[in-house]
C-alpha cells in the first residue's frame, strides 16, 4: 500500500486544532477552530475523495479519540468520511489505549517501541492506500523514517501564529513533486495540493549563475 498523509494547514504551516476551539488544546494552544471561518460550501469536497481511496486508516491516539467522538455520531449512509471511519479498518498508535478503550468498528492498536517497523510492514501489504489523517507526532515520525509516499493538503489563507506545524525545525530534508493542485470551490482562496515524494534525506541543491550574460543554474 502507499502511505498517504492528509492535512489541513495554515499559511504558516500550523495543523493543530483546525476544526474546533477545544479540538486540540495541548501545549496551551488557544487558537483552535481557525479553519472554520474560512470554509465555504463545496470547499472540503476533496476530503470525501481522500477517504474514498482509503484501504485502511492510521491515526495517533489524540486524533483517534477526537475523530471517534465526532464521527461515531454521523450515521448518514451517504457520508463517505463517516462510512470510512465507522466501518473501515483503522489502526491507532498508542501504548496507553487498551483494546476496550479503542473500541470503534474495526480498530487495531499498534503498541511498542517498533511502531515504525509495524507501519513499514503494513505499508508493504498489497492494496491501495494506508492513510494518515491529522496525527501530528505520528506524521513527523513517519516522515523522518522516509515512509510517506504522498502528502495531500488543503492550505487555508490564514496565519495562525502558534501551534504544531506540519514541518518544524529538525525535519528530515525531502523533495516532493506536485501532481495535483486546484483552488478549492467557494472562493475563500484555499488551495488543495497533492505532492508525491521524489527524494528523502536531501532536497538537492544548486545556484543561479550568469554565463555569457544570460541567467542560468549550476
What are these language model-derived features?
Residues 1-218:
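Enzymes that bind and transform nitrogen-containing heteroaromatic metabolites
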